[in-house]
A protein has these predicted regions:
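...with weaker cross-activation on analogous glycine-rich loops/strands in unrelated enzymes
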Residues: 2-71
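Low-complexity, Gly/Ser/Thr/Pro-rich intrinsically disordered linker/tail segments
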Residues: 68-144
Length: 144
């Protein structure tokens, strides 16, 4: 399936709710973001409106961060992504230290948000939809 169709197709299958790129307002863990040629998944949102994301490119998979909503490149999400990549994936981080994505990641991607009510294919037993990116990463990497 082409990348730009993924968010809408997943929603059409009854797995969640679709939002066009102009309707995206926030990011929750698991949000599928799709545009022409690329798909990424949100890990969570930070207080400055930036998002920690998980994406794959030809070299491999990486945690990365978007700019803050105000356009500031040195966002909370970029700092979190750098910290986790450097700590848990040091060889990968040494080879690919840039964990910053551009503002297009916030404006040019449609969104599919999972239905976590139990009526579809997903639930949220950890209640990640209510947590910040920092809290989610700490839980995923067992920093309790």
């Amino acid at each position: 399936m082409p990348a730009q169709k993924m968010a809408r197709e997943f929603a059409n299958r009854g797995w969640g709710m679709y939002r066009s790129k102009s309707s995206v307002r926030d990011y929750q863990a698991g949000d599928i973001m799709s545009s022409g040629g690329h798909v990424w998944m949100a890990v969570g949102q930070c207080d400055d409106g930036s998002a920690v994301i998980l994406h794959a490119s030809p070299p491999g998979v990486q945690l990365a961060g978007t700019p803050a909503r105000n356009g500031r490149a040195d966002s909370q999400a970029v700092a979190l992504a750098q910290r986790y990549m450097k700590t848990y994936f040091p060889r990968w981080y040494e080879k690919y230290p840039n964990c910053a994505k551009d503002g297009n990641y916030l404006t040019q991607y449609a969104q599919m948000r999972w239905d976590i009510t139990g009526r579809a294919v997903m639930t949220d037993p950890e209640n990640y939809k209510e947590k910040s990116a920092d809290e989610i990463l700490a839980d995923l990497f067992a920093q309790r």
